[in-house]
Amino acid sequence: MKIKIAVFPGSFDPLTLGHISIIEAGLKLFDKIIVAIGSNEQKKNMFPLSEREKMIQLNFKDNKKISIKSYKGLTVDFCERENAKHIIRGIRNSNDFNYEQSIAFMNYRLNDKIQTCFLPSTQEYAFISSSIVKEILLNKDTIDKLQLKKKLKPFLSRDVLNQII
């Protein structure tokens, strides 16, 4: 039987509870998920690639169905190299859907053998955004450590919190 491989691409800067929730939902649908950390020259990342890889490893260290890889270039080309037929995208709201749908259409035009699967965020995590986390972290010098952890706790796993604070 052929295994179903999916790619969950993103910058994961940092990895949030929202990302973790989408990965866990994807594990119910696919035999293997490649968490693919994309390199986007237009984005300035707060955390270096090695730290983002470590965040993912810490959260999924015991799960053999998950692998972590970094890549450059088009996501559909990466999927083809990895024999993945599916791209997972998390959807928090209609704005996410409209944006992700246009990307999915483009990807389909580039490679019609790769399907994008939209996984809705749970209500619990629909408000989470890496941008909000980065905004809090940019102001960390004005917040004591205990308060900083308290502010970030709704967004990040314990492993990620301990790594970045």
Please provide the spans of the model-predicted regions:
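Nucleotidyltransferase catalytic core that binds NTPs
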Residues: M1-I165
